[in-house]
């Protein structure tokens, strides 16, 4: 078993939550900026904006030009990554621990000072629009997105997650900045440092780089709740594909509901791994190529 390594939690006066896990097993450190803003926080007029902002986050600040953040990180032996999901967006830097301070400075600069340059935004939107079009050519993606749209009438689950071409082309720099400045605030952010660092020194550096950021409330748009009874719904899509996709879903309670652990367990028994009931009942009988 791996040894238990405690996590030190600190909340700065401006509301930023800092989690540090000290682990000297390898000379590597990971820095993750976790912002509580994702697809659920987008109004219908701005579908996809959190994902676009993810693409723009490391695209330049007043002191670092376009491409410089990626070059500096790579020069330090590290790499950048990011992802957007329903309730958060996360930005990751992994690099040798000798470059920890430089990596943290880059993360802090991007977090507080991302320019979202208009010309760069226009170029990046073309990349994302092509990404959205590729999803239209992916039967599993189309099946999943169509399933969510069929299952929900009002909830933001119903929308195509990264947006479509028409909506993405309407995203301006002003709208991007408004979303960025509202949600990317210390009280709405968790900064995680894990790896070959000294906990006290790490917290000290974080305090110096992030502590002066203003503590401002987030104006959160939670979106509509789902108040209709779904009943049985069915949708069939036809296309020139080699394998049929079958997707099923049920509305369930939220994560805090007492029935949720039992539902998670049931889902695992049905679908997790080759020993699952669906795998044995469907895949082993050669009724499907995968479950």
Task: Give residue ranges: language-model regions.
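Acidic/histidine-enriched segments that form metal/cofactor-coordinating
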Residues: 35, 61-62, 68-179, 224-226, ...
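Short, flexible turn/loop "capping" segments at secondary-structure junctions
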Residues: 24-25, 49, 82-86, 157-160, ...
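Solvent-exposed coil/turn segments that connect beta secondary-structure elements
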Residues: 23-25, 36-38, 61-62, 96-98, ...
């Amino acid at each position: 078993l791996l040894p238990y390594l405690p996590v030190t939690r600190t909340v700065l006066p401006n509301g930023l939550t800092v989690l540090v896990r000290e682990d000297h097993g390898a000379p590597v450190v990971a820095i993750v900026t976790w912002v509580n803003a994702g697809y659920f926080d987008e109004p219908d007029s701005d579908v996809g904006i959190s994902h676009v902002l993810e693409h723009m986050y490391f695209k330049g600040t007043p002191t670092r030009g376009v491409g410089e953040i990626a070059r500096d990180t790579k020069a330090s032996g590290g790499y950048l990554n990011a992802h957007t999901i329903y309730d958060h967006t996360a930005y990751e830097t992994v690099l040798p621990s000798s470059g920890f301070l430089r990596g943290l400075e880059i993360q802090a600069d991007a977090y507080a000072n991302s320019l979202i340059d208009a010309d760069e935004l226009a170029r990046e939107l073309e990349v994302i629009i092509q990404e959205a079009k590729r999803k239209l050519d992916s039967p599993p993606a189309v099946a999943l997105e169509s399933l969510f749209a069929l299952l929900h009438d009002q909830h933001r689950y119903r929308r195509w997650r990264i947006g479509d071409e028409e909506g993405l082309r309407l995203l301006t720099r002003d709208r991007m900045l408004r979303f960025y400045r509202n949600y990317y605030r210390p009280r709405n952010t968790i900064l995680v440092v894990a790896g070959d660092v000294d906990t006290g020194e790490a917290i000290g550096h974080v305090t110096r780089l992030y502590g002066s950021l203003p503590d401002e409330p987030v104006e959160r748009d939670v979106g509509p709740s789902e108040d209709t009874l779904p009943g049985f719904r069915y949708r069939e899509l036809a296309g020139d594909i080699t394998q049929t996709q079958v997707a099923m879903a049920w509305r369930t309670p939220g994560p805090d509901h007492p029935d949720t652990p039992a539902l998670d367990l049931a889902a695992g028994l049905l679908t997790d791994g080759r020993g699952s009931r669906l795998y044995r009942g469907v895949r082993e009988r050669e009724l499907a190529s995968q479950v």
